[in-house]
Amino acid sequence: MNLRLSCLLFILVTSLPAGRCSIGNKGISFETCTAIEGLCFFGCKLGWVWIAYCNNIMSCCRKDTDFVLPQTKGI
């Protein structure tokens, strides 16, 4: 029972719009975050800059244009 519950929890957590999600997504747009040209994630992606909180647990991130790392050019 505990193993099934753990697997279900793992699948639910990995399907959330996280910055390092295995499914790949473009984030969630909240009005407060899109007003400052950002997207909401559960942690910022590589090459994105943290701006503010979207709500209690999500972070508003914006793509970094000043210090672009070579690893992030393909993202």
Curated annotation (Swiss-Prot):
GO terms for molecular function: lipopolysaccharide binding. Has bactericidal activity. May play a role in the antimicrobial protection of sperm and urogenital tract epithelia. It is found in: Secreted. Induction: By androgens. Transmembrane segments: none annotated. The keyword Disulfide bond applies. This is Beta-defensin 42. Disulfide bonds join 33-60, 40-54, 44-61. Keywords: Antibiotic, Antimicrobial, Defensin, Disulfide bond, Secreted, Signal. Residues 1-21 form the signal peptide. GO terms for cellular component: extracellular region. GO terms for biological process: antibacterial innate immune response; antifungal innate immune response; defense response to Gram-negative bacterium; defense response to Gram-positive bacterium. Epididymis-specific, with highest levels in the initial segment and distal caput. Pfam families: DEFB136. Belongs to the beta-defensin family. It comes from Mus musculus (Mouse). The keyword Cytoplasm does not apply.
